[in-house]
Amino acid sequence: MPLSYPHFRKLLLLDDEAGLLEEELPRLADEGLNRRVAEDLNLQLPNVSIPWTHKVGNFTGLYSSTVPTFNPDWLTPSFPDIHLHQDLIHKCEQFVGPLTKNELRRLKLVMPSRFFPKVTKYFPMEKGIKPYYPDNVVNHYFKTRHYLHTLWKAGILYKRESTRSASFCGSPYSWEQELQHGSTSINDTKGHGTESLCTQSSGILSRPSAGSSIQGKFQQSRLGLQQKQGQLANGKQGRSGRIRSWVHTPTRWPAGVEPTGTGCAYNIASRSASCFHQSAVREKTNPSLSTSKRHSSTGHAVELNPVPPGSVRSEGKGSVLSCWWLQFRDTEPCSDYCLSHIINLLEDWGPCYEHGQHHIRTPRTPARVTGGVFLVDKNPHNTTESRLVVDFSQFSRGNTRVSWPKFAVPNLQSLTNLLSSNLSWLSLDVSAAFYHLPLHPAAMPHLLVGSSGLSRYVARLSSTSRIHDHQHGTMQNLHNSCSRNLYVSLLLLFKTFGRKLHLYSHPIILGFRKIPMGVGLSPFLLAQFTSAICSVVRRAFPHCLAFSYMDDLVLGAKSVQHLESLYTAVTNFLLSVGIHLNTSKTKRWGYTLNFMGYVIGSWGSLPQDHIVQKIKACFRKLPVNRPIDWKVCQRIVGLLGFAAPFTQCGYPALMPLYACITAKQAFVFSPTYKAFLCQQYMHLYPVARQRPGLCQVFADATPTGWGLAIGHQRMRGTFVAPLPIHTAELLAACFARSRSGAKLIGTDNSVVLSRKYTSFPWLLGCAANWILRGTSFVYVPSALNPADDPSRGRLGLYRPLLRLPFQPTTGRTSLYAASPSVPSHLPDRVHFASPLHVAWRPP
């Protein structure tokens, strides 16, 4: 007869009328009983022939592809002019006096941040914007391009100008070596890599070797480049020999040089800061490749003028035309949906390229990307704004993956010890926290995003634009990209972006200037940064509490008035060092703080209500007697694991689910097991704050017997059959708790001390978790343990009771910025379980 739920509760000793604990509890360690119960509750893992269920409520499992939804009305969020002050450390010292070693170390980590991957794979520019929304490709392309442009304007990205230079907006840092006024000229006196012959973005000409005197050759005539090309091309002139082969047989496209959708024209548009408009472009100039000396924001740079659309210079098979977008202007419309209708809407489409206020030298940066980007909703509650997702997962994959530094996540008990108090709380919102931390320019070549330009994007979409060899350079080929879809999309986008459509249709390569979210290093750096800032604030206001996890900052003070004045002082300090706060999102919590998914008050902590509601919904939808795919189980365990510390049996209750996930098997919920879990999660108990105290109760065990020392009283007992030592020690601790009621117990067993009961026989783990809930353990060495003798059957010998004080720990989220080293390996299950899984360390 299957095991009923009331019978099962009784078996687990969860009812009050259970028999004598010393007799009942050891039975739960019996393997046979555990096996029979598992069979009854269907917990062993059957190889099920019934098809697996792949969806439970909102949880999807294997073989499910969630189709993302594109929102054509997405707004691009605005980024304030974020600039973390370079003299951050100096400002902190003015605020609080000399910084501690830990604070200094953490702040130096991010000023500037560095990123050195072992290997970087470069992808073609076409992979820059991911085709994430097949039905809205053009729309997504422009919205993403606009987002990238916004980030560049906000000083968060560098724009690759040439192989060795980049431009950016905003305030420069001292480690960003600016191209000095005039250092882009040909007469390069410095022997080390300042950019010469700067054709700014296209990077067509590389710098010559030191001391080469090409300057005169360029000033002889407007056609100097044409005449001296032979001399330029000889190998003695450093690497500039590349120009000749480039002009004649273009094989690779530098960042600014794009083939049209048809591959017939190369864009050698000038990228000077004073980019000329179409009026200038359409002037008649010499059809040959002419050079002019123009004054750009970096000084006198020699640049290549764009060749006007009218003039075609045959060079091999191809023809050098200016810009794909503007070529449509001088052509006959091919249909009602020809792009030339849109291009003729405006006389002046603005510059082909924009340049930043500052130009810097960078390491060699290829015209490639290292990660793709796409847009999604900002968060489940805000679908009006978009968020840029950057996929730099290449750095976390394969055998060249970067092992990201681990950092301490505050565990639940530490958080409760620290924040469960009668303080009044408020939380601060740091806007775009990741984009505060500057990256060294040396990291730029590893973190490249961008796009290949609309023409190539469209060429990939349009099935008709198969480029045949004999078609090279024909106008028909240009119009291959015209289609009704593209026409309608561009017409709608024209309302939003106006003449920026032209700018966005050009290719671009951008590198990160601030830390991107898609790299495992970023969360670590952000956590280090905010914890150091909080440490500084705590030392400046010792009577208050400041605490942070990632970009979540909370402030606590004794009274509301006190909190308000603290808020003003801290806000002013943060603004003075360049940290941007979103003051409209400041939340005042009163005496119960909502933080990291918990509600924390003076009584302890509980999960927030929205999590409790999710759990209830999950149980409502949970099917019984149907095999559920392990991926769904993983998601269910992720949700239940978060609230497990607040239940009677804790994590051990979820062990059958963990086992099925590890074995990648389906799991069948029996009615009894579901009822058991449901009851567990319907009644949540707060996790209370630990109190300091003196340990008066000690437990010890041998495989055959147990012993307790409760004050001056000694007790002992034997087990019916020998047990594994850890199991025996756990039983002894349970007896000590039930006999004495003490919340502080001394033990010499590290497993009991860690309070992880998941490796014990299942039934025992569940029962012990409930008996020992809220108990704190103190480590006592075996030689000094007063319960050692009774456990060996010697009651006559009295060792004196130790004075063992217990001090609750706040873990590695310590109040002062002291941070012990992180253990090298945590069990795999930690990832989706809960912060509670960080073990207690013996004091």
Curated annotation (Swiss-Prot):
Gene3D superfamilies linked: 3.30.70.270
Notes on how activity is controlled: Activated by host HSP70 and HSP40 in vitro to be able to bind the epsilon loop of the pgRNA. Because deletion of the RNase H region renders the protein partly chaperone-independent, the chaperones may be needed indirectly to relieve occlusion of the RNA-binding site by this domain. Inhibited by several reverse-transcriptase inhibitors: Lamivudine, Adefovir and Entecavir.
Site (Priming of reverse-transcription by covalently linking the first nucleotide of the (-)DNA): Y63
Classification via InterPro entries: DNA/RNA_pol_sf, DNApol_viral_C, DNApol_viral_N, HBV_DPOL, Rev_trsase/Diguanyl_cyclase, RT_dom, Viral_Replic_Matur_Polypro
Residues covered by region (Disordered): 180-221, 282-313
Region spans: Spacer: 178-346
Stretch list, region Terminal protein domain (TP): 1-177
Protein residues bound to Mg(2+): D429, D551, D552
EC numbers on record: 2.7.7.7, 2.7.7.49, 3.1.26.4
Keywords on record: DNA replication, DNA-binding, DNA-directed DNA polymerase, Endonuclease, Host-virus interaction, Hydrolase, Inhibition of host innate immune response by virus, Inhibition of host RLR pathway by virus, Magnesium, Metal-binding, Multifunctional enzyme, Nuclease, Nucleotidyltransferase, RNA-directed DNA polymerase, Transferase, Viral immunoevasion
Nucleotidyltransferase is among the record's keywords: yes
GO BP terms, alphabetized: DNA replication; symbiont-mediated suppression of host innate immune response
MF-aspect GO terms: DNA binding; DNA-directed DNA polymerase activity; metal ion binding; RNA-directed DNA polymerase activity; RNA-DNA hybrid ribonuclease activity
Pfam families: DNA_pol_viral_C, DNA_pol_viral_N, RVT_1
Reverse transcriptase domain ranges (all copies): 357-600
Additional free-text comment from the UniProt record: Hepadnaviral virions contain probably just one P protein molecule per particle.
Function: Multifunctional enzyme that converts the viral RNA genome into dsDNA in viral cytoplasmic capsids. This enzyme displays a DNA polymerase activity that can copy either DNA or RNA templates, and a ribonuclease H (RNase H) activity that cleaves the RNA strand of RNA-DNA heteroduplexes in a partially processive 3'- to 5'-endonucleasic mode. Neo-synthesized pregenomic RNA (pgRNA) are encapsidated together with the P protein, and reverse-transcribed inside the nucleocapsid.
Family per record: Belongs to the hepadnaviridae P protein family.
Entry note about domains: Terminal protein domain (TP) is hepadnavirus-specific. Spacer domain is highly variable and separates the TP and RT domains. Polymerase/reverse-transcriptase domain (RT) and ribonuclease H domain (RH) are similar to retrovirus reverse transcriptase/RNase H. The polymerase/reverse transcriptase (RT) and ribonuclease H (RH) domains are structured in five subdomains: finger, palm, thumb, connection and RNase H. Within the palm subdomain, the 'primer grip' region is thought to be involved in the positioning of the primer terminus for accommodating the incoming nucleotide. The RH domain stabilizes the association of RT with primer-template.
HAMAP family (alphabetical): HBV_DPOL
Descriptive protein name: Protein P
Organism: Hepatitis B virus genotype F1 subtype adw4 (isolate El Salvador/1116Sal/1997)
